[in-house]
Each structure stands twice: as C-alpha cells, then as structure tokens.
C-alpha cells in the first residue's frame, strides 16, 4: 500500500529528480498525541533555491483521492511557508495541527515548489536573482485522529485494520518462494478498513514474524 500513497509528484521543468530538493520521507505521520511535526529539507545542489510550500486536504492518500475543503481555514499551519535555501544547506519546516479533535484520520498533500536561482544580471547598478529551473514536489501528511482507536485482526497471513488510524505493518522471516532467497521482509501502510496479505514472507512458518506500529508503539502480532 505504501507505493500507492500519493508519492512524489515530480513535475519537472529543466531539472532532473536527482537535482531536486530533498524533502525526506514521501509520507509523514502526526501521531494522536502530537499536534506538531518537523520535516528537514535539504538543498544538495550547488546553487541557491527558492522554496514555497502550501497544503491541501485530500479525501484519501490513495490513487483517486480528491482535494477537499479544510474544516477550518487554519486547520494546519506551517512555518516558514517560503524561504531561500543556500547551496548545500538544510532547514526545518514545522507543521501545526489546529483542526477538530475528533475520531477522523485526515490526509494532506504538502506541495513543495522548488526554484533554482542564478544571478542573471551583474553590474554595479543592478543585480537580481532569477529562477532558472523549477520542480513541483508532492508529499503526504497523515494526521491521526485525536480520539484514536487502534484495532486489528490477523488470520492466515492477512492483517485487517479495524480501527480508525493507519498502521505500519511488517513481516519478516523465511521467504515463501525459493526464488526470493532465504530471508524476506515486507513493510506496508494499512489504512482504516483495509486488509493486506503478506505475499513474500512465509508467515505460517514458525520462524515467520508479523508485527505492527500503532503510532510509536511496537506491537508483536505473531
């Protein structure tokens, strides 16, 4: 499921993905016990970059998710929303959730508009920095319900999320297929109401292990 989250939507104009701004993980999670989140971004190029950031709420982070209205104008705040990032420099962007304290999980797309800068005019009277290349990057912010209810069911190598918050699930142990080698590992995000079957790890083997993360709490399942 992780690969189906709305991943980096990189719409490039004159830059390659390797040159674009490094914004860290594609999916970020704000757990129920926290109302703040920090993301470190890095400019690994040799030129300064102008970064503008905004958020939009999504009906779902999966393919087909639509942009929907916020419950309130200041539902999620961020700072700074615009910055100049020198070459080889990094900075921290902070997000603050101010929305309803209910039992709903919420999803947001963080849109990073990244422009490279160059000195286009140089003389004693006039010097200006002009954007020469740009990239639009989309990542996902998941805000867990303030009234969280973690629940799941496991049977025959399949996990079902019966709670109201996304789980990070994993399995590791002997591979189900000899062609995959001896040891395999699987990691997925499992949204509320969804099920996932492990297809590479032999979870029926006594050495096969299944576990999950409920927020920051690690929970062995099998």
Curated annotation (Swiss-Prot):
Pfam families: EcpB_C (PF18649). Keywords: Chaperone, Fimbrium biogenesis, Signal. The keyword Transit peptide does not apply. Residues 1-20 form the signal peptide. Part of the ecpRABCDE operon, which encodes the E.coli common pilus (ECP). ECP plays a dual role in early-stage biofilm development and host cell recognition. Belongs to the EcpB/EcpE family. This is Probable fimbrial chaperone EcpB. It comes from Klebsiella pneumoniae subsp. pneumoniae (strain ATCC 700721 / MGH 78578).
């Amino acid at each position: 499921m992780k690969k189906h989250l709305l991943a980096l939507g990189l719409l490039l104009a004159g830059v390659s993905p390797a040159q674009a701004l490094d914004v860290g993980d594609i999916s970020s999670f704000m757990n129920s016990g926290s109302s703040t989140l920090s993301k470190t971004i890095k400019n690994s190029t040799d030129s300064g970059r102008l970064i503008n950031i905004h958020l939009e709420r999504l009906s779902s982070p999966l393919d087909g998710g639509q942009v929907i209205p916020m419950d309130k104008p200041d539902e999620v705040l961020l700072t700074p929303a615009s910055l100049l990032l020198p070459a080889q420099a990094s900075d921290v962007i902070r997000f603050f959730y101010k929305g309803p304290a209910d039992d709903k999980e919420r999803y947001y797309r963080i849109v990073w508009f990244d422009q490279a800068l160059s000195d286009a005019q140089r003389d004693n009277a006039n010097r200006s920095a002009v954007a020469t290349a740009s990239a639009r990057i989309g990542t996902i912010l998941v805000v867990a319900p303030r009234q969280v209810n973690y629940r799941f069911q496991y049977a025959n190598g399949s996990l079902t999320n019966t709670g109201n918050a996304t789980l990070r699930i994993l399995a590791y142990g002997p591979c189900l297929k000899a062609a995959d080698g001896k040891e395999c590992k699987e990691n997925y995000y499992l949204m509320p109401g969804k099920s996932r079957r492990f297809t590479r790890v032999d979870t029926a083997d006594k050495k096969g292990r299944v576990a999950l993360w409920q927020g920051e709490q690690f929970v062995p399942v099998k």
